């Protein structure tokens, strides 16, 4: 089960401080992650972001200079979804971080797409790998990972999908599919089978079953 605990002002969390990251900004779960060795990324933990990690373009520019990731592909589509809503449509880059650390937990081969939200986002898929505790009164973020290290290497599709009004639509088109499909096209079949009706919130929390 995906678990987030919110602590009260009266009672501090019992989770070890070794699993704690302080909020960079009081009142919001904005924390500092490490990309590779010595590259800080300030990011917002945002359960409205359906991916594991979404990279703000200004952070992309800074980390590119530091060689913190590899560029995998270029695409065009809708911006990322988060607490601030959906970002403007724009060109997006898909990158891969060889190493991204959330406190003491190491994530290898982390794929991210660039977007234009106010912050780089650490999304809801973090909860696949551990429990999160948010202590707003003390400005603390705790992550209790199930394992000390994860390899997130995975296959990549040439289009990205999202749910709109119960239907699957194409939200991003990557390099090899440009000119074949367009952003906003409706998906009617996956692997030859007609698609069903989808719940937007369920798709963010658990993904789209047919694509797993």
State what each model feature region is:
Residues 1-212:
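Pepsin/retropepsin-fold aspartyl endopeptidases
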């Amino acid at each position: 089960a995906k678990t987030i605990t919110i602590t009260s002002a009266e009672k501090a969390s019992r989770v070890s401080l070794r699993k704690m990251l302080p909020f960079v900004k009081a009142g919001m779960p904005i924390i500092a992650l490490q990309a590779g060795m010595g590259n800080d990324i300030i990011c917002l933990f945002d359960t409205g972001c359906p991916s594991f990690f979404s990279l703000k373009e200004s952070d992309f520019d800074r980390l590119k200079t530091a060689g913190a990731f590899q560029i995998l592909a270029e695409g065009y589509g809708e911006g990322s979804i988060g607490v601030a809503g959906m970002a403007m449509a724009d060109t997006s880059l898909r990158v891969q971080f060889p190493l991204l650390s959330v406190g003491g937990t190491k994530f290898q081969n982390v794929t991210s797409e660039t977007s234009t939200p106010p912050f780089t986002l650490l999304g809801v898929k973090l909860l696949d790998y551990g429990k999160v505790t948010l202590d707003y009164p003390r400005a603390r973020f705790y992550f209790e990972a199930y394992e000390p290290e994860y390899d997130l290497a995975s296959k990549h599709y040439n289009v990205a999908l999202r749910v709109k009004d119960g239907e699957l639509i194409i939200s991003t088109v990557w390099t090899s599919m440009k000119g074949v499909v367009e952003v906003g096209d409706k998906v009617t079949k996956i692997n030859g089978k007609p698609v069903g009706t989808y719940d937007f919130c369920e798709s963010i929390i658990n993904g789209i079953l047919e694509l797993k």
